[in-house]
Amino acid sequence: MLPFFPEPSLSYTQQNRTAVLLLNLGTPDAPTAQAVRPYLKSFLTDRRVVELPKWLWYPILHGLVLTLRPKKSAHAYEKIWFKEGSPLEVYTARQAAALAKRMPDLIVRHAMTYGNPSVADVLSELKAQGAGRLLVIPMYPQYAASSSGAAVDKVCEQLLLQRNQMSVRTVSRFYDDTGYIDAMKNHILRYWAEHGRGKKLMLSFHGVPQKHHDLGDPYPDECRHTAKLLAEALELTEDQYVVSFQSQFGRAKWVTPSTQDLFGKLPKQGVTELDVFCPGFLADCLETMEEIALMGREQFYEAGGKSYRYIPCLNDNPDWIDALVALAEENLGGWR
């Protein structure tokens, strides 16, 4: 077996193109237990995601999680699946297509850290198209080792197999990027103008285990800074918004406050009109459409809430595409 992949037979000038890769988390190929299981296995065996010794984690993963969770997750995916496929895949593809239209001199593709289109397949395609320089934009404004770090790991794994390695730049974070903040502000204001506005805005970010933060992961701090900048842009007072963290998994302690806990507590504190937006998610997916838009609504109403609005993610919003173009241009530097 060859230690490196064969390289395409291209001249130097043919291998001098620049590519941009939008890299998101991933999704199963279908809303079925059979498709969800390998996706979850790929995700939950990543050392960046679960920082436990294999001897401890793998019996739990294979004996319980991969036995029970695929069917439950598949049912959740069924609720939000589009005719074109997974919402995360559909929206990320649209973002890449919009970026490609705005930057026609570049090769623009998207890939998933777990699932399809895979990083391995997309990088092979880029090499075949003559890409010698690659800008990787993990689609996570706030850096976390379990998301941004894992995404870059996948790219580096492929670099290890390239005989003629591409030059690579990565965008590790953009939690305070002006274009990103402005795009969210405009998006929320337009939503409020069309659908009305609740008494409080919840800014819900994906959670991480508290231990990750204790060991130096900056993610929770960057989330709170994003929330502060967005609240200032929206001219909100401190009592008009709340920051929370969702999607806890397992028994470990996670960063707080929990989004799910607040759904139960806020109505009892007199907050019966709630709007929810997820700044850390750039494309709607299972965690936003099912966990927040559907399940969150049920939890809030069961606790006594009267009005609940889920504000969709930026997705392919034109203001966000403008910000994405600017972000790419800034990080491409002399590569264009």
UniProtKB/Swiss-Prot annotation:
UniProt GO BP: heme biosynthetic process
Organism in which the protein naturally occurs: Neisseria meningitidis serogroup C / serotype 2a (strain ATCC 700532 / DSM 15464 / FAM18)
Source species, domain of life: Bacteria
Physiological role: Catalyzes the ferrous insertion into protoporphyrin IX.
EC number in record: 4.98.1.1
Residues binding Fe cation: H206, E287
Name under which the protein is recorded: Ferrochelatase
Main location as per UniProt: cytoplasm
Lineage: Bacteria, Pseudomonadati, Pseudomonadota, Betaproteobacteria, Neisseriales
InterPro entries, A to Z: Ferrochelatase, Ferrochelatase_AS, Ferrochelatase_C, Ferrochelatase_N
